[in-house]
Amino acid sequence: LDQSALVSLMVELFTAIRLVSAYPAPAVLPEVHSFPQSEMRRRLCEGRPCSIKAYYHPDWGVVIDETLDVHHDPFDRSILLHELVHHLQKTTGKFEVVASFCSRRMAEELEAYEIQNRYLSKANTSRRALFMGSTGKCADADEAFRAQAHSQPKGD
């Protein structure tokens, strides 16, 4: 990814997020990395086939599938925007008051999809992002899972 074009795009996307939500612009832009789908599968799906196109991790930033055309395709750009919403959720601490990990995760995803679809609507594109629910195990009582989940990236 061309870094200067990427920074410009992120500033544009954070402005769009601010216009369709109550989030402020971030003090620091997250890092964005582009990986092949095979690397995404290795990192997130233990090598099994999966359809994750991007994810956010508070320590690593945003990781996107290298096949996404975030500079020219409005829907692909909205996928990056969705992950940038997760960055804002984390840096503002908006959902930290939700005690249940599962409830917090669901609320974060629902909001990110809502903002993504508002963005797509304003971009005058007919495509919309669909939230199909959580595909993984989520049990608040399972302490081992919760500890592991906090160190796992968010993928959509």
Protein language model features and the residues they cover:
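Auxiliary, metal-adjacent structural segments of Zn-dependent hydrolase domains
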Residues: 1-63, 69-70
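Substrate-binding clefts and substrate-entry loops adjacent to catalytic sites
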Residues: 64-71, 90-103
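Post-HExxH zinc-binding segment in Zn-dependent metallohydrolases
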Residues: 99-135
